[in-house]
Curated annotation (Swiss-Prot):
Region (Interaction with membrane phosphatidylinositol 4,5-bisphosphate and RNA): 14-33
Record's comment describing the protein's domains: Late-budding domains (L domains) are short sequence motifs essential for viral particle budding. They recruit proteins of the host ESCRT machinery (Endosomal Sorting Complex Required for Transport) or ESCRT-associated proteins. p6-gag contains two L domains: a PTAP/PSAP motif, which interacts with the UEV domain of TSG101 and a LYPX(n)L motif which interacts with PDCD6IP/AIP1.
Pfam family, one: zf-CCHC
Region called PPIA/CYPA-binding loop, residue ranges: 217-225
PTAP/PSAP motif (motif): residue ranges: 456-459
Lineage: Viruses, Riboviria, Pararnavirae, Artverviricota, Revtraviricetes
Disordered: region residues: 108-127, 438-500
Name assigned to this protein: Gag polyprotein
Region (Interaction with Gp41): 7-31
Amino acid sequence: MGARASVLSGGKLDAWEKIRLRPGGKKKYRLKHLVWASRELERFALNPGLLETPEGCLQIIEQIQPAIKTGTEELKSLFNLVAVLYCVHRKIDVKDTKEALDKIEEIQNKSQQKTQQAAADKEKDNKVSQNYPIVQNAQGQMVHQAISPRTLNAWVKVVEEKAFSPEVIPMFSALSEGATPQDLNAMLNTVGGHQAAMQMLKDTINEEAAEWDRVHPVHAGPIPPGQMREPRGSDIAGTTSTLQEQIAWMTGNPAIPVGDIYKRWIILGLNKIVRMYSPVSILDIKQGPKEPFRDYVDRFFKTLRAEQATQDVKNWMTETLLVQNANPDCKTILRALGQGASIEEMMTACQGVGGPSHKARVLAEAMSQVTNTNTAIMMQKGNFKGQRKFVKCFNCGKEGHIARNCRAPRKKGCWKCGREGHQMKDCTERQANFLGKIWPSSKGRPGNFLQSRPEPTAPPAESFGFGEEMTPSPKQEQLKDKEPPLASLRSLFGSDPLLQ
């Protein structure tokens, strides 16, 4: 314990024992607290010897401070103790732990300000460029660095590969950062093909230059000495201005960013070209039935980049059309998420749509719906028989059981004809038809067919007006009197006497 308590001695120890643990409290720091701090430092794999110097205490504070918010009470107590110990080493008069923490915070703020000031001074001393490619030389003069061939090559390769797709615009903006109108013209001149698109770009630049001249008219009178003339539209486009004038405008006070203005005109023309090369409207981007939602979102935002609209309109398109043009499966999920769902939440929710498990679930639901529909149709048409058909016993004649399970006395003989000596399966008695006769009949044709075919006879002569009327015979008159009301049906139930 003596080695651990040897952190303080003499006057420092007296000052240590006068500091209170809490403001207005009675308890004060003792040697046992130093012993506890040494053990805690060992537990946290820190060197307890750092407590003997103010520099070591600062190192401990810097090491522990980031973990204070999420640390335990022991860690916070250790931090407070080291802060008080630092004040004792520096002979800073504090009455309690809170004052020591305030002093530490004040010292850290001053140190941070000094560090930031030193970094700013160093950056200012080492600063070479204010607006690349306009750089400051060793004499403090602003000079121009020509755009590198590597940048030009990257731009040409993008145009050749992408052919003015929507991603060409951000690529041009990145490669032309801080460029002068002369640099921008160099980038445009390196484009060999797509001359129709380049002509459209020139027309847009000319229109914007004319609009600039209309909004910024030339002031009457001579230009004051030492002051530059105001740039015209053609000056901004780099056709009537020199490189030195462009640099002077861009670095003057007040500065006129002719490079950024010209760049904005070019991007406006590129938007029109992208629109021409990408004729697909955002309204036509719809998700296919088997297309993953991720691929659909990629196509949607790629087309959205080519839309000439404000950011508010694009946000509305994203919130409305992205859900509206999704396939039915994804649309159901997205509408369940509600308004204001982020793209991450949408993609997470629709991640499994279109996969095997989802297809199986959809197929099962569809089959279930078809089955329920068919059942309902059958019940409506009366084709669905809800009750079972009861069987009838051949032995007793009752329903509800079969002869094998019948408890009544077993009937003797054939169950079909009622005669003894054989069973029903060996019965030779044939089933009678609906006429009450056995079919087939040994007498020839069945009773519902004509038994004989009448020979055709010529019509009576009197029907044609030939000769005299024939007097009917007594036999025919007798048959006529006995003729039944429905003589035509007699052929169905026996021999027809008229045909014999």
